[in-house]
């Protein structure tokens, strides 16, 4: 293609064209003249005018076909830009009009009833193949829900916290004390020990030890008292004036029943039976009683040498069975504890030695039985060791013939009631045991008679003989049930003026100087002086003789594991404790962090209880049990097992077993009513911070459990509550289905008396009751007050929309975008049917019982909401939410804030056909003609154009930013190219 001509060439070419056109139309000029004229034009000096230059400029711009096409392309692009700009401008104008158009009005409070008649086929009896449709009438009751909110009963009371108090309790469990209270045998004691160890070990296996900032409980006076009271409360040391043993090997105590199995009435096992010498008729040859039992008689009791040691100087006993009348077994353990402490404080003077008036007359000439009682006649049966080791004299109660020189011939003289007893029929009307001896002299001497050659099995003939079937002869005689020849003789054993020490008082004094650990260590060793701990013996048998013991014992330094000091101990770091708590999942409102709230106890309202609430509360388990002394052995163990298992279960669930905490004491300290205490006890939480075994032996065990309690003190308790269930409403506007819900400022409606209160809860936990830090009283949504307007949230949903929730009363909560069973669409309704029917593809069943109206149903103020026309589209755009309130001013404010988001549609960032169709739907109610045109364009682009271009056309939506960038670059290049065609200087050609 030839390049464009220069200006001179173009002017000459233009003149030659004009000359050629002029010469073609004339006949007067010859050919030679024409050639001459052309040559003159070519040789003529050209002087271009402005008009020539302008025309030449136009020539250069369109000199070639490519330049013409470029101009055409540029014009088309400019035309498209103009058209698109006009379209966008018109669309923006239309969007602004659509925004300002008000949409639907939501108005709840609609109640209606319908009779639904589904067709149900019924088989005719005469034709098994024929089925005929018959109408079935189903009554459907529909009640719309005000403001789209359903209220269901909230059964849990709502408790508002006033403050949180922390409280520590140390629970001590000593199986020996429990066994003594229940009078258990050694075999049952072992079972009890195993049971306690099993339950406590299982609790310890799932608990971790950590510290609380309340100090070491072992430095607390109450802990020291409880610990030592549990170990040494009834332990005493008696010092003889001069060591003297029991004078004889034998003991006559005919007032005690004999052992054995007898028909009829049986007696409880007596401790003295351990020393009974049974009468046996088969003995070795030449066997005598003296050879084995000394002066003791067969059929009586033998005192072993261990109780008759010559050099025994002290008696150590741990028993409550020698106390005088002030100690009543019918009292509770706490009452007896209080009485005992008062006695010990009054009967000691800063030392562990008891005053003389605390002792019985038999022990001291100045005794007044202030603490201990006199030993009675029957004590030898149940407490033989106490009589043998502590009595200064003994009165034998004998029914043996020959004692006191009583014989059969003298019975009539000794007992007036027996005068002439054997000479008349009086004996037929008296007791068969009356007026005779228990043991009669049958032989002149005791001897054995053997067969020839027999030395091991010979017949033995005792000096006294009588059938043992009369096992309760002496006891009945002592009760004076019949006249008998009783011989009572006094035996002087040892001198008076005993000196008695209280081990509990010794602990009280020594622990202040040496510490509780050292004192416990020394005194426990002292109780184990003979190899068997005295406090682990049965109460009635816990009496042992000691040979010159050192008392008070020495108190060596005992290294103890401190709980508060970090020096010289098995370090349990705080960080490790926190890590353990987190790993174990403890969450007692922050576990250890909550312990800092113990400072709340400094409230002035609790001044009288500060020292109690701040220190550890020490509790003995045996003091909290029922009276187990009336139970038999296994029943007492089962009773304790039930208590322990319940305690363990409660602690694992972080609850409090109030059996072991005095709620009366706590109520006095907190000054709360009974109803408030019920709530406090119900919502209180517990946390075990240590479980340890403090003593272990085959027949006894002792444990300590450290418990931390978190007590929530209520400020207010809301009852009769209703829970808010926000269902919402459906709105279809601008071709979009929208789920609209009101953001109510409350979660609970409370009805107290006649006042309805709307509550907003903050920082709540659910522990049986709902416990909240903050509860605010707010106003409901309504048109009456500008301050009560509530935001409305809109969310785009897809059609069809069906939401059916069955309610507890047998009704159904329905929200649907369509109608079925004459249930209205868009409106949330409570539907109740009287027969089973199918609606929305689901079976609606009648309630099991007739529907009952509640006495109180929350009532809300009437509320009408007018929503913007484009509320559905607003909600659909990238999840944007618009807040719409019930006042017109608020709506305008919300619309202004939403305009910026709505006008983003002008800068299209999505699928073009969908955007145009959305615009058409929004314009339909405002400008139907424009909406039809836009709908047609959108349908063409999404339908026909999609079919023509296929996937490539749809990809343009994703490649649009790239294509626009490339197009802009090409357009700039084209413009620069066209500009370069314009001559800026004279060309030589």
From Swiss-Prot:
Region Fusion peptide, as annotated, extends over 577-599
Summarizing the annotation, the consequence of altering residue 18 to R is: Strong increase of subviral particles release
The consequence of residue 34 to R is: Strong increase of subviral particles release
**What Pfam families would the database entry show?**
Foamy_virus_ENV
Q: Which UniProt keywords apply?
A: Cleavage on pair of basic residues, Glycoprotein, Host endoplasmic reticulum, Host membrane, Isopeptide bond, Membrane, Signal-anchor, Transmembrane, Transmembrane helix, Ubl conjugation, Viral envelope protein, Virion
Cytoplasmic-side segments: 1-65, 983-989
Q: Where is this region: Involved in virion budding?
A: 1-15
Q: What is the effect of changing residue 14 to R?
A: Strong increase of subviral particles release
- UniProt keyword DNA repair present: no
Mark the transmembrane ranges.
66-88, 962-982
Phenotypic consequence of residue 985 to S: Increased budding from plasma membrane and decreased budding from ER
Q: What does this protein do?
A: The surface protein (SU) attaches the virus to the host cell by binding to the cell receptor. This interaction triggers the refolding of transmembrane protein (TM) and is thought to activate its fusogenic potential by unmasking its fusion peptide.
Q: What is this protein called?
A: Envelope glycoprotein gp130
Q: Which organism is it from?
A: Human spumaretrovirus (SFVcpz(hu))
Recorded name of the encoding gene? env
């Amino acid at each position: 293609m030839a390049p464009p001509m220069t200006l001179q060439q173009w002017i000459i070419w233009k003149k030659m064209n004009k000359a050629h056109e002029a010469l073609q139309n004339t006949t007067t000029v010859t050919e030679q003249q024409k050639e001459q004229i052309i040559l003159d034009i070519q040789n003529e000096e050209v002087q271009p005018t402005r008009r020539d230059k302008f025309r030449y400029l136009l020539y250069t711009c369109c000199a070639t076909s490519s330049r013409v096409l470029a101009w055409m392309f540029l014009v088309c692009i400019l035309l498209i830009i103009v058209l698109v700009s006009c379209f966008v401008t018109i669309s923006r104008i239309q969007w602004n009009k659509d925004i300002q158009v008000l949409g639907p009005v939501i108005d709840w409070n609609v109640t209606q009833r319908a009779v639904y008649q589904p067709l149900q086929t019924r088989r005719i009896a005469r034709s098994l193949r024929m089925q005929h449709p018959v109408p079935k009438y189903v009554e459907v009751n529909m009640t719309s829900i005000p403001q789209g909110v359903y209220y269901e009963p909230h059964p849990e009371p709502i408790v508002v916290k006033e403050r949180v108090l922390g409280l520590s309790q140390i629970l001590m469990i000593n199986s020996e004390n429990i066994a003594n209270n229940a009078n258990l045998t050694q075999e049952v004691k072992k079972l009890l020990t195993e049971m306690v160890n099993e339950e406590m070990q299982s609790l310890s296996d799932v608990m971790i030890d950590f510290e609380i900032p309340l100090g070491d409980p072992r430095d607390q006076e109450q802990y020291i008292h409880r610990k030592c009271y549990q170990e040494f409360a009834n332990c005493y040391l008696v010092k003889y004036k001069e060591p003297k043993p029991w004078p004889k090997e034998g003991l006559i105590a005919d007032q005690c029943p004999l052992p054995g199995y007898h028909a009829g009435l049986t007696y409880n096992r007596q401790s003295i039976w351990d020393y009974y010498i049974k009468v046996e008729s088969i003995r070795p040859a030449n066997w005598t009683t003296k050879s084995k039992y000394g002066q003791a008689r067969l059929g009586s009791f033998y005192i072993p040498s261990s109780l008759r040691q010559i050099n025994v100087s002290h008696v150590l006993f741990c028993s409550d069975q020698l106390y005088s009348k002030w100690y009543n077994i019918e009292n509770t353990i706490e009452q007896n504890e209080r009485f005992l402490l008062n006695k010990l404080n009054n009967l000691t003077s800063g030392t562990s030695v008891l005053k003389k008036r605390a002792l019985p007359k038999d022990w001291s000439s100045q005794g007044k039985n202030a603490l201990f009682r006199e030993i009675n006649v029957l004590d030898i049966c149940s407490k033989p060791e106490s009589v043998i080791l502590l009595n200064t004299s003994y009165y034998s109660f004998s029914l043996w013939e020959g004692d006191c020189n009583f014989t059969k011939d003298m019975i009539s003289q000794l007992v007036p009631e027996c005068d002439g007893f054997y000479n008349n029929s009086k004996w037929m009307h008296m007791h068969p045991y009356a007026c005779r001896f228990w043991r009669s002299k049958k032989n002149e001497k005791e001897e054995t008679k053997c067969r020839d050659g027999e030395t091991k099995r010979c017949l033995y003939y005792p000096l006294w003989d009588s059938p043992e079937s009369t096992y309760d002869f002496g006891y009945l005689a002592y009760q004076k049930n019949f006249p008998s020849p009783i011989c009572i003789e006094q035996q002087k054993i040892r001198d008076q003026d005993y000196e008695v020490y209280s081990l509990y008082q010794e602990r009280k004094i020594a622990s202040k100087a040496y510490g509780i650990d050292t004192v416990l260590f020394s005194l426990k060793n002292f109780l184990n002086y003979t190899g068997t701990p005295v406090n682990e013996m049965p109460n009635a048998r816990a009496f042992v003789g000691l040979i010159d013991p050192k008392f008070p014992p020495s108190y060596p330094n005992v290294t103890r594991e401190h709980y508060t000091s970090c020096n010289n101990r098995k370090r349990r770091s705080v960080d490790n404790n926190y890590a353990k708590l987190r790993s174990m999942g403890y969450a007692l409102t922050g576990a250890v962090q909550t312990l800092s709230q113990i400072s709340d106890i400094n409230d002035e309202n609790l001044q009288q209880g500060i020292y109690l609430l701040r220190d550890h509360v020490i509790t003995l388990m045996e003091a909290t049990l029922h009276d187990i002394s009336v139970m038999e052995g296994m029943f007492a163990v089962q009773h304790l097992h039930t208590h322990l298992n319940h305690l363990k279960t409660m602690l694992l669930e972080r609850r409090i077993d109030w059996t072991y905490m005095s709620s009366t004491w706590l109520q006095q300290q907190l000054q709360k009513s009974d109803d408030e205490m019920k709530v406090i006890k119900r919502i209180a939480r517990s946390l075990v911070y240590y479980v340890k075994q403090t003593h272990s032996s085959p027949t006894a065990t002792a444990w300590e459990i450290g418990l931390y309690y978190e007590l929530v003190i209520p400020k207010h308790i809301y009852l009769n509550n209703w829970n808010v269930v926000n269902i919402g409403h459906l709105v279809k506007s601008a071709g979009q289905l929208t789920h609209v819900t009101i953001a109510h400022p409350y979660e609970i409606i409370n009805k107290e008396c006649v006042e309805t209160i709307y509550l907003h809860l903050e920082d709540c936990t659910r522990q049986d009751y709902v416990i909240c830090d903050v509860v605010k009283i707010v106003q409901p949504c309504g048109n009456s007050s500008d301050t009560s307007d509530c935001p409305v949230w809109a969310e785009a949903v897809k059609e069809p929309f069906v939401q059916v929730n069955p309610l507890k009363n047998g009704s159904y909560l329905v929200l649907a975008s369509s109608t079925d069973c004459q249930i209205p669409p868009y409106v949330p309704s409570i539907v109740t049917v009287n027969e089973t029917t199918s609606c929305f593809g689901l079976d609606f069943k009648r309630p099991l019982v007739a529907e009952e109206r509640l006495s109180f149903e929350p009532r809300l103020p009437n509320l009408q909401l007018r929503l913007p026309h484009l509320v559905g589209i607003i909600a659909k755009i990238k999840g944007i939410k618009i807040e719409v309130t019930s006042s017109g001013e608020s709506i305008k404010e919300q619309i202004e804030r939403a305009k910026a988001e709505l006008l983003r549609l002008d800068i299209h960032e999505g699928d073009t056909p969908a955007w145009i169709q959305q615009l058409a739907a929004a314009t339909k109610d405002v400008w139907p003609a424009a909406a039809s045109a836009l709908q047609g364009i959108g349908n063409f682009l999404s339908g026909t154009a999609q079919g023509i271009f296929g996937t490539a056309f749809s990809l343009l939506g994703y490649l649009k930013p790239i294509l626009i960038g490339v197009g802009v670059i090409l357009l700039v290049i084209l413009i620069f190219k066209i500009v370069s065609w314009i001559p800026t200087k004279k060309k030589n050609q």
